[in-house]
Amino acid sequence: MRPSKRAAQDLRPVTLERNVARYAEGSCLVKFGGTHVLCTASLEDKPPPWLRGQGRGWVTAEYAMLPRATHTRTRRESMSGKPSGRTQEIQRLIGRSLRAVTNLPALGERQITLDCDVLQADGGTRTAAITGAWVALHDCCKWMHGRSIIKEFPLREHVAAVSCGIYQGEAVLDLDYEEDSVAQTDANFVMTGGGALVEVQASAEGAVFSEDELSVLLALAKGGIAQLVNIQKLAIG
């Protein structure tokens, strides 16, 4: 039995609240159960220096956790001078996931930065961030398109992400911290609305896992991401 009493294939309650940041071109407060992430999209009217003159734009991401997002206070990474390896890995993952469904030439020579700040962490912060950041990016693109800054809407399709794992010998979807901290296998899946894979991260924590078990996790993720995409569609109207 899962601590939350959920069935193996059940997501936590998920909400996507748009337009929560007054000044950002797009914003979304995403909640996966007790994990809450604020995602904002900011438009810059220039691309990164290495992309100038190439006629296309860029989508990138930054990720951070507030000091009391966790049970005990965590020192701000900005105080140490640079982001941790974990933070760099997550923000690169978010950026890759969003670029996978974005027509970058349609942006022109512009950059959109997604800032994903974890307000409260209860497992699955990176998957929640990707799912919410897509909504913020969508609204930023809509803002640009509505003002004729761009001629073509640049988002090709949805992208969302979810965690899966093997907890007490059972494959389960969308682990919270209590499950994740003792899971035998931990995996994150990023997929498009059409069901194509963007990224798969899977690690043996307490015991190795088989190809068959990975297939079960993938099937759970497909079902979960289909639900998340439907929630995104309802959120954007």
UniProtKB/Swiss-Prot annotation:
PROSITE patterns: RIBONUCLEASE_PH. Transmembrane segments: none annotated. Belongs to the RNase PH family. Phosphorolytic 3'-5' exoribonuclease that plays an important role in tRNA 3'-end maturation. Removes nucleotide residues following the 3'-CCA terminus of tRNAs; can also add nucleotides to the ends of RNA molecules by using nucleoside diphosphates as substrates, but this may not be physiologically important. Probably plays a role in initiation of 16S rRNA degradation (leading to ribosome degradation) during starvation. The gene is rph. InterPro entries: ExoRNase_PH_dom1, ExoRNase_PH_dom2, ExoRNase_PH_dom2_sf, PNPase/RNase_PH_dom_sf, Ribosomal_Su5_D2-typ_SF, RNase_PH, RNase_PH_bac-type, RNase_PH_CS. One of its GO terms (molecular function) is tRNA nucleotidyltransferase activity. Its EC number is 2.7.7.56. Homohexameric ring arranged as a trimer of dimers. Phosphate binds at residues 86, 124-126. It comes from Beijerinckia indica subsp. indica (strain ATCC 9039 / DSM 1715 / NCIMB 8712). HAMAP family: RNase_PH. Keywords: Nucleotidyltransferase, RNA-binding, rRNA processing, Transferase, tRNA processing, tRNA-binding. This is Ribonuclease PH. GO terms for biological process: rRNA catabolic process; rRNA processing; tRNA processing. The keyword Transferase applies. Pfam families: RNase_PH, RNase_PH_C. It catalyses: tRNA(n+1) + phosphate = tRNA(n) + a ribonucleoside 5'-diphosphate.
